[in-house]
Amino acid sequence: MKQIINTKFVKNILFSTLALFSAVSLVAQEEEEAPKFTLSGSIDAYYRANLNAGNGVDAQAPGSSFANLPGFALGMANVIAGYEGEKVGFVADLVFGPRGTDAIFASPMYSATGDIVNQLYAYWNVSDAVTLTFGNFNTFLGYEVISPVANFNYSTSYLFSYGPFSHTGLKADFAISDDFSLMLAVMNPTDLTEFNPVGQYAYGVQLGYSGQYANLLIDNGSYEIDFTGGFDLSDSFFLGLNAAYFNGDEEDGIGSFAGVAVYPQLATSENFTLGLRGEYFTETDFFGAIGASDAEGDASVFAVTLTGSATIGNLMIKPELRLDSTSEDTTFVNGNGEPIGSLSSFLLAAIYSF
């Protein structure tokens, strides 16, 4: 018997199927393109003690930034809110606590709440290869950053401490190819993040190739050249590198510095990594980073930091031993009040990220 096909019924089935696929596709597209709000951050606290110097009221610490308070001490609470659309978005990065205050030491200049703003910027993905960022953002120079989550060592290097922390201005990032990138920026003078009270501007350039970055900052008669990079030498061994030279403005009486730091890190298991930071830092013309200097204002320091990093879920525990040995025998004072040229210390930090 010849089968009779109901064409109207078939058309309805086809139409319904197409409509269903279109709806699913539209929903998927909307889900893919829908702006996303994110909330992340961290908290950290630590214990620090000198091994060859006092730990009382006049407790000393290395000349580098952060993690310099004696006994049980607070780092900071860091809350980062972000909104990411298909083309545009923003980041509001707020910090509360001693580490955050030290990081944005030049604020507040105007706002009563200026000392909590670490980053505050909007961005526009002009194309797949070009992004514009406008506002206050952390520096592009250097290996280390303000957040302890992104640093392997809890205490920081001299190179990081005396380079810029943050900038406010406009920067353009260009993805030249899969390997090459370029960044150009015009900004307020370094660390003047709330507004520009001097009417002068700084300029920045970064050239990147496969995770290695050459950086230049020109700022009101001073300039800094910086290299930051790293290499995975094996599945478990990483070597980070940072080198910089800063030439201060002689007319303003600003000295100069240069230094190099290496960061070998060995992962002994999925939850534990052992890392070393070896840094040599030298300064001239009474730059003032190290502390004591000779009659010409020159000084140097060799600092070695050994850090273990144990991960328990979102919690990191970092025990750390550090030795700072300077060129001058009067940089520090021991427990008997006698001048010494080196300082050894122990630190234990806890960092929780979310």
Enumerate the predicted regions with their spans.
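Surface-exposed extracellular loop regions of Gram-negative outer-membrane beta-barrel proteins
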Residues: 78-99, 175, 181, 228, ...
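Outer-membrane beta-barrel pore domains
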Residues: 63-66, 100-103, 108-113, 212-216, ...
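Outer-membrane beta-barrel channels and translocator barrels
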Residues: 34, 84-88, 127-129, 177-179, ...
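Short N-terminal segments immediately surrounding and downstream of signal-peptide cleavage
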Residues: 30-45
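Residue-level detector of the transmembrane beta-barrel scaffold of outer-membrane proteins
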Residues: 38-42, 89-91, 131-133, 181-183, ...
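Residues on the lipid-exposed face of transmembrane beta-strands in outer-membrane beta-barrel proteins
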Residues: 41, 45, 70, 74, ...
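Surface-exposed coil loops of outer-membrane beta-barrel proteins
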Residues: 46-71, 100-119, 127-208, 214-216, ...
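Cleavable N-terminal export/targeting peptides
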Residues: 1-34
